[in-house]
């Protein structure tokens, strides 16, 4: 659509310049005829003609030439603006297409250096444990049923008041239904176990 519009604009301006040139040729031809008709025949007329020509000012630019230059600059600026706009929108659409390939569904910050991220990469969902110096895959969602179940759990988390709850994240996303602990003490133990694992990993990284 944009290419057709540019072509029509270019064609209209081309026709305009063709018409302007033809009009200028007609005007110049009529001017030449008038000049030829006013040429002197006798010697006295020649002397008067030379004196009249010497008193007329000589203009470097014609008004029509000046108008052509202004129109050309306006058209060049207009076409440049359209091309810049088309390039901008093409880059923007390409960026949006690439950004749709990778989407972060959930980001949960455990502490300053560690976080849990659920990322959709080419319609495959992965759950990562991200620390300052490592990137660990916790779980991969392979089947469509697991993906739909994950979407349902994510919607429940978004509607839940415990959106930032550590226990809620692991209860509704990382654990299977049969693996969900039944008491609050089990949740505390699970949290302590994960925090201890993270601390151990950090200690090993520091030694390394």
From Swiss-Prot:
Domain of life where this protein originates: Bacteria
The keyword DNA damage is assigned to this record: no
Any Gene Ontology biological process: bacterial-type flagellum organization
InterPro entries: Flagellar_biosynth_FliO (IPR022781)
Keyword Cytoplasm in record: no
GO CC terms in record: membrane
Sequence intervals crossing the membrane: none
This protein's UniProt keywords: Bacterial flagellum biogenesis
Function of the protein: Required for flagella formation.
NCBIfam families noted in UniProt: PRK13414.1 (NF009950)
Protein name: Flagellar protein FliZ
Lineage, uppermost ranks: Bacteria, Pseudomonadati, Spirochaetota, Spirochaetia, Spirochaetales
């Amino acid at each position: 659509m944009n290419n057709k519009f540019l072509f029509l604009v270019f064609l209209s301006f081309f026709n305009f310049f063709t018409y302007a040139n033809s009009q200028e040729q007609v005007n110049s031809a009529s001017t030449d005829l008038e000049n030829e008709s006013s040429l002197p025949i006798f010697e006295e007329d020649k002397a008067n003609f030379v004196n009249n020509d010497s008193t007329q000012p000589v203009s470097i630019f014609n008004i029509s030439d000046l108008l052509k230059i202004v129109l050309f600059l306006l058209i060049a600026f207009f076409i440049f603006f359209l091309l810049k706009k088309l390039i901008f929108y093409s880059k923007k659409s390409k960026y949006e297409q690439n950004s749709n390939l990778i989407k972060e569904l959930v980001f949960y910050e455990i502490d300053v250096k560690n976080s849990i991220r659920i990322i959709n990469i080419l319609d495959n969902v992965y759950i990562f444990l991200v620390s300052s110096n490592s990137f660990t895959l916790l779980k991969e969602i392979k089947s469509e049923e697991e993906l739909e179940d994950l979407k349902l759990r994510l919607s429940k988390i978004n509607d839940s008041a415990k959106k930032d709850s550590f226990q809620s994240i692991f209860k509704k996303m990382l654990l299977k239904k049969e693996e969900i602990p039944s008491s609050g003490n089990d949740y505390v133990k699970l949290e302590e176990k994960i925090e201890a694992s993270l601390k151990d990993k950090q200690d090993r990284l520091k030694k390394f």
